[in-house]
Amino acid sequence: MQLTPQEKDKLLVFTAALLAERRKNRGIKLNYPEAVAYITAGILEGAREGRTVAELMSFGTTLLSRADVMDGIPEMIPEVQVEATFPDGTKLVTVHHPIT
């Protein structure tokens, strides 16, 4: 299987997000890379489903709460930026203060 660097990055994010989702479902608080991967994967999947940039900017703030992550993690992630592929091309989605 031949994958581009971007495809490899997306698979790595998906794998980390899957692990984060499993831990979150078991009540384990997420660390920094898990939280970023979880939010990033949610945005990538939303773009694939056809949501707009504005919808995803709002959606990104609903994925995790302070209760889902370790202490100090919300302050470490002031924003998440994701290059997502939409039906009309690639766009940058920025989610400010993703963990509330």
Curated annotation (Swiss-Prot):
Entry's localization field: Cytoplasm
Pathway connected to this protein: Nitrogen metabolism; urea degradation; CO(2) and NH(3) from urea (urease route): step 1/1
SS bond list: none
Primary location class: cytoplasm
Keywords: Cytoplasm, Hydrolase
Known EC number: 3.5.1.5
Gene Ontology cellular component list: cytoplasm
GO biological process entries: urea catabolic process
Recorded GO MF terms: nickel cation binding; urease activity
EC class of the enzyme, as a word: hydrolase
Pfam families for the chain: Urease_gamma
Gene3D superfamilies in UniProt: Urease, gamma-like subunit
InterPro entries linked: Urease_gamma, Urease_gamma/gamma-beta_su, Urease_gamma_sf, Urease_subunit
Catalysed reaction equations from the record: urea + 2 H2O + H(+) = hydrogencarbonate + 2 NH4(+)
Family: Belongs to the urease gamma subunit family.
Subunit structure and binding partners: Heterotrimer of UreA (gamma), UreB (beta) and UreC (alpha) subunits. Three heterotrimers associate to form the active enzyme.
Protein name: Urease subunit gamma
Species name: Acaryochloris marina (strain MBIC 11017)
Taxonomic placement: Bacteria, Bacillati, Cyanobacteriota, Cyanophyceae, Acaryochloridales
Recorded name of the encoding gene: ureA
